[in-house]
Amino acid sequence: MTTASTTSKDGYTFAGVLLLVLGAFNLIDGFMLLDRSELFADAYVFSNASTWGWILIVFGVCQFVAGAMLARGSGGRTMALTLAGIGMVLWFMLLFTFPFASLIGTAINFSVIASVLSTDPN
């Protein structure tokens, strides 16, 4: 039986593109929270909307950098796994504020982790 073989970088490219998308989501949400922080005054765990906006902006930039590194093939496996794991926790903490977006963000982070872990690092 013959199976189709893929290069070991396919999973990393897929995960890198997903991290780029997640970084863009986090940047958009972060800027939205900074712009409209008065609309979400008491809906956040541990802090206010402006603080969460800055957290999401910084985290989005980090995810964007990790996604670019992973998609280009220049490393970033550990960074991608770490950021995807932290991203799942962050999106879960925003579950009651953005339920649909949180579920999508958590699912994409899980896909990044599954893709990176299922790809042979050699």
Which residues does each PLM region occupy?
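Membrane-interface extramembranous regions
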Residues: 2-122
